[in-house]
């Protein structure tokens, strides 16, 4: 099986993919989240692993927006990864004039960076491992990445565990063009409400009446007009469960757009 991930080698997505893959599986990297999911759409890979949310900085909007644009993909599993950020450079004693990392990592380490490198340029790039590759090549440069990158890119640790909270975690989802056949514990849906008073309230009330527990609700701009939103919801239970199936069917009647992203 071919598994796609956000590369290059050494990224947190790579780390998550390593935890999931079996010995016979092949990992295939892409430079952006959009390209990872596009590879799945084009059948270049069988599944892909992408970050969805972080304990400090919240949703990974690139993933959410790309899922909205690709209607034929399903969430089939999730991996929660402990994330311990480290500041690295070619040598410990080098002067640091700029720091590369993924935008999420820069935000997750904001307190440390403000206290120690307030005047240093912070440059967001496509992944933490790509940041490590840049720090390997450039002088007066550091990166924020994971411990895997130390040996992969020949870097030295300047400071470790620099994230704002020590119990930092990122949730990754596995995407496939096939649905899950096994029994599952969680279902993700996405919907937009009709333009009428109390539409969202009515939908949330249906979950309450059916005693279905919601574990997450997140909104994204619908990109139609100001004030229009798409809602991502995680709920406990399998979409094949009769109570959940009936509730979701009723909710769909109150939506302009409704889609089950998958059970896992």
Task: Show the residue positions of the predicted features.
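Domain-level signature for soluble enzymes in the chorismate/prephenate branch of the shikimate pathway
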Residues: 1-264
